[in-house]
Amino acid sequence: MECKNLYRVQEKDLDRLREILTICFKNDPLYSALIEDQETRERLMPHLFSCDVTECFETCEVYADSEELKGILIVSDESDHRHAFYNYFVSLKESLVTDGWLIHEDPSTKTFWNFMLGKDYLNSAWTAQLHQTRRLHVIYLAVDPEY
């Protein structure tokens, strides 16, 4: 997907992308429910978003308002199946890394189980129920609150 009005995020921008997502979702009700302990949430979220950013950069279209990345848009063209196996294995790898971080930061595995129970809210499987062959799924839309 090409867009003349948006900046196409580059690999060099991934740290900033992770930072924006961490800031924007810091007090998100869903993440607060999944990661109940605030200290654990603050330690864990940068790692979780690092996994998401890696996966999204490999499998989705990632745009920003400008090279400063004040606002970001990550979309998945779910009608494009050209790289389905590659995307599956990238997602699988990042899911395993995410699970590792969940257990590392909360050895009680409570947070890990919260994510397992909340997986329906954290994936795009529900879009199959739309019965549309051409879908563009917005994965993340976030704006740095500083701007």
Task: Identify the residue ranges that each predicted region occupies.
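Active-site rim helix/loop that mediates acceptor-substrate recognition in acyltransferases
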Residues: 38-61, 125-127
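Helix-loop element at the rim of GNAT/NAT acetyltransferase active sites that forms part
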Residues: 19-39, 51-55
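Short, polar/charged, Gly/Pro-enriched helix-capping and turn/loop motifs at alpha-helix termini
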Residues: 31-32, 63, 80
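Conserved beta-hairpin
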Residues: 57-76, 142-146
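Hydrophobic, aromatic-enriched alpha-helical segments typical of multi-pass transmembrane helices
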Residues: 13, 56-59, 131-133, 137, ...
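Conserved acyl-donor/pantetheine-binding loop and adjacent beta-alpha core of acyl/acetyltransferases
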Residues: 74-140
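A short beta-loop-alpha structural element at the N-terminal edge
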Residues: 5-19, 27
